[in-house]
Amino acid sequence: GLTIPSVTAQAELMRAVLTLSGLDPDDVDFIEAHGTGTPVGDPVEAASIGTVYGTGRQQPIPISSVKANFGHLEPASGMAGLITAILSLKKADLPPMPLDFTPNPHIDFQKLNIVCAAAGMSLRDADVHTAGVNSFGFGGVNAHLIVQTLKQPVTDRDQTAQILPPLLLSARSDAALRDLAASYADYWESAEPSYYEMAYTAA
């Protein structure tokens, strides 16, 4: 049967995930909300986010939901939210929602200390950015995860491995293989790419 969302259950899960991550609520830059789009679901989710991430925070925590742009997607909605959160972290920017988007009037954003990033927004200037992602289901699925950027990107100079990974190339003939190897050599000399990234892509 269908289940009714619970502020308590959602908030308990968020706190548990924060504890496992070793993070404080203030460490999280934004929440990619599930965004059920229902009169009951959205206020419950907003209340749980405000309870955990909004309480005691100096600035309201931004919330967004990519599903406002193209619908719910049913079983794939969680993956859409995760992908959006990762891209938002990479670009340090939250995407805008549709121009006609209107926040749920039953949500007291000021009291919960949350803000709807409907117009899009840039993340605060920091070495590390962190996002929380919600995903719920009709059958009672209650999921919350935290994703975070790396403090420093890994470069060739940072690599400590003494053995380089193989550069795997394949072709249908010896001549084609030689041509492919030559093209990689030309690319290596002209673009100066990361060998590790090139080997990973080729594999």
List where the protein language model places each region.
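Condensing-enzyme catalytic core of the thiolase-fold
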Residues: 1-169, 175, 179, 190, ...
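Conserved short hydrophobic interaction patches
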Residues: 183-187
